[in-house]
């Protein structure tokens, strides 16, 4: 408990009014790191490592193994555009109709 003076002071709320807590001087020297210091990124001076990391991130974002997921996402975006579109002639399923027409035409 010597390293946690704030915990001791918070606990003093539950003690009776006449109780006094004394914190030893060693405990006051210890300070806990703030949340900002915990999550700092490690600095890297090697530019080749930064390049490799950015290339890996690009590859991760660019690849999608399931073509249906790409179609579903694009269809959802078309529906959103159609919902807020002022053009009465806009048809979100226009691309699908073209694909079906091309298949039937062949």
UniProtKB/Swiss-Prot annotation:
- Keywords, alphabetical: Signal
Residues spanning the signal sequence = 1-22
Region described as Disordered: spans on this chain: 23-46
Q: What is this protein called?
A: Uncharacterized protein At1g24060
